[in-house]
Design a protein with these regions (language model features):
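Hydrophobic h-region of N-terminal signal peptides that target proteins for export
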Residues: 9-19
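Flexible glycan-contacting loops in extracellular carbohydrate-active proteins
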Residues: 189-220
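Beta-strand-rich interaction surfaces with strong enrichment in secreted/lumenal proteins
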Residues: 75-81, 152-160, 208-209
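Short, aromatic/His-centered strand-loop micro-motif at the edge of beta-sheets
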Residues: 141-167
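Carbohydrate-binding surfaces in secreted/extracellular proteins
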Residues: 160-194
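Low-complexity, Ser/Thr/Pro/Gly-rich disordered linker/stalk regions
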Residues: 21-99
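Bacterial N-terminal signal peptides that target proteins for export
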Residues: 1-8
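Secretory/extracellular carbohydrate-interaction modules
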Residues: 70-142
C-alpha cells in the first residue's frame, strides 16, 4: 500500500473539501459543546478558519456510550486514552439517522499527538454507510493519504431508514497497523510507510474518534487491549 504525501495531494483534497462544503454546509447543533468528563475535541482547519468550533457540535454521555451530534468535521479524544507498542483499540459506531443526502465517514484514530494544536499527528480509519472504507491521517497538520476510499464487503450498508452499525478497530503490531471493520481487515499498512520523517511520529499516542461533518452517532465499547 503506497503512502502519498505531497502538496499536490493536499491541494486536491482541499479543493474537494471546499466543493463538498459548498454543496452541504456544516450544521450548527443547538446546545452544543462537550459535556463528557475528560474529553476534548478540535474541528478541522477549514472549519476553524470559518470561526467554527466543537461548540457547534454536541458530545454527551448516553446509555453507557457517547452520543454525538456533529456539525463540523473534527476529532475527539480523552488524553488518558493512550496506546503504545502492540495493541488493539476498537469501538462500535451506530449511525442513528442520516443528517444529509449522502454518506459521511466516522471511525477511530491512533498515534495522536499535538491534537489541540495546528500541527496534529494521527492516523484514522473510517467507514461509510455506503459500504466503503478509507485510511488517512495528518502529519504535522498535513494530509497523509494512506488508502483511497474503496468498497469493501465487510462494511455494512445503511438500511432504508439510514441506520447502520459498524465495529471499527485498529490492530497494531511490531511492523504494521491493520484497520478492521466488522472483524475483517480492510487495510493493512506497513509501519515503514506511515512512520518516519514527513510521516507520523509514531503509532504510539492518543487514540480517539474521527468524524466527518453532519453525522449523528452512538459510540460504545471504546476499549484498548
Amino acid at each position: 500500500m503506497r503512502l502519498i504525501q505531497a502538496s499536490v495531494v493536499a491541494v486536491a483534497l482541499a479543493v474537494c473539501s471546499v466543493s463538498a462544503q459548498q454543496m452541504e454546509a456544516d450544521r450548527k447543533v443547538a446546545g452544543g459543546g462537550i459535556t463528557v468528563k475528560g474529553w476534548q475535541g478540535k474541528v478541522d482547519a477549514a472549519a476553524a478558519k470559518q470561526g467554527k468550533t466543537v461548540n457547534d457540535s454536541k458530545l454527551m454521555e448516553m446509555g453507557g456510550g457517547l452520543h454525538m451530534q456533529v456539525g463540523p468535521a473534527a476529532v475527539y479524544w480523552n488524553p488518558s486514552n493512550t496506546a503504545t507498542g502492540e495493541y488493539t483499540v476498537k469501538a462500535t459506531f451506530k449511525e442513528t439517522k442520516v443528517a444529509s443526502d449522502h454518506p459521511h465517514p466516522y471511525g477511530l484514530f491512533i498515534g495522536g499527538s499535538k491534537l489541540d494544536s495546528e500541527t496534529p499527528n494521527l492516523l484514522y480509519c473510517v467507514a461509510y454507510g455506503s459500504g466503503e472504507a478509507l485510511v488517512r491521517g495528518f502529519s504535522e497538520g498535513k494530509v497523509l493519504q494512506v488508502s483511497k476510499r474503496v468498497p469493501n464487503a465487510a462494511v455494512n450498508k445503511a438500511a432504508a431508514d439510514g441506520g447502520v452499525t459498524q465495529e471499527i478497530a485498529w490492530n497494531v503490531t511490531a511492523d504494521k497497523a491493520d484497520c478492521l471493520v466488522n472483524g475483517t481487515v480492510v487495510a493493512s499498512v506497513p509501519k515503514a510507510e506511515i512512520v518516519g520523517a514527513g510521516k507520523l511520529e509514531s503509532t504510539d499516542g492518543v487514540y480517539g474518534i474521527r468524524v466527518s461533518h453532519n453525522v449523528d452517532l452512538m459510540v460504545t465499547g471504546l476499549t484498548k487491549k
